[in-house]
Amino acid sequence: MKSRDFLKFYNILQNMGSRYFFFRAKYELERKTGILKKKFIVNPTIRQFISLVEWKRTAFPFFFHDRNDLHLSKQSNLVLEQEVKQIITGSIPYFSATWIQLGLDYDWITNPDTGYQYDVSKHWTEVEDIDLKAGDIKYVWEKSRFSFLYPVMRLDAHEQQDHSDFVFGQILDWIAKNPVNCGPNYKCSQEISLRVLNWIFALYFYRNSNRLTEAVFQKIIHSIFWQ
C-alpha cells in the first residue's frame, strides 16, 4: 500500500470511526477487485414490472394523488414565470445560487465549471470522484438531481399550465445518455436517491397527462429499478 493510501485510511479511521472505516475498506476492496462491477451490471434485460394502467390503479399513497390534489392559489407569479422560462431554455440554478446556461442539448456528463467531460462508457466504479482535472464532480451531479423540475411543476400548479412534455423529455434524455451503471451519475447513492424521488414526484404530479404514455412510463420505471 502506498503511503498516500495509508494516510487516507488512517484519516478516515480517526475522523469517522471504526464502523465506517471497515465499511469503506470493504467498499474499496470490492471496487478495485471488480466485485462491485459484477454486482452492478450494465445493459440489463428489459423487464416490465407493472403497466401504467395498473400503477394508476394500485399506486401507493404519495404526498398527493396527482396535481389536482394541490389546492394552490391560481394566480400569476412573475418571478416564478421568469425562473421557469430560464429552465426550459437550458439554464439551471446551481446550488440554489448561480445560474449556468447548459443549453438544450446538454450531455449530463460535462462539468460546466471546468469543461471536463466524463467517459460515460466507463462503469461507475472506474470513475474517480476526486480528480483535479475534472474538478468538483458535484457540478455534474447538480442537474442530474432533477430538483430543477420543482419550479416547473409549481408554475403548472399555480397557473394551470402543462409542462409535462418538457419534464418527461428531460427524464428520457437523461436515461438515453446515461447507460445503466455507467458514468459519473451512478457514482453516489445519495444523488441517485434524490433523482429517483424527484422522478417519482413528477410521475405522480403528471400521472394523468397525455404525455405519460405506456412507453414513457416503462422507460422511467426500468431506469428507476436499475438505479
Regions of interest found by a model, annotated:
Residues 1-59:
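Membrane-proximal basic amphipathic "stem/tether" segments
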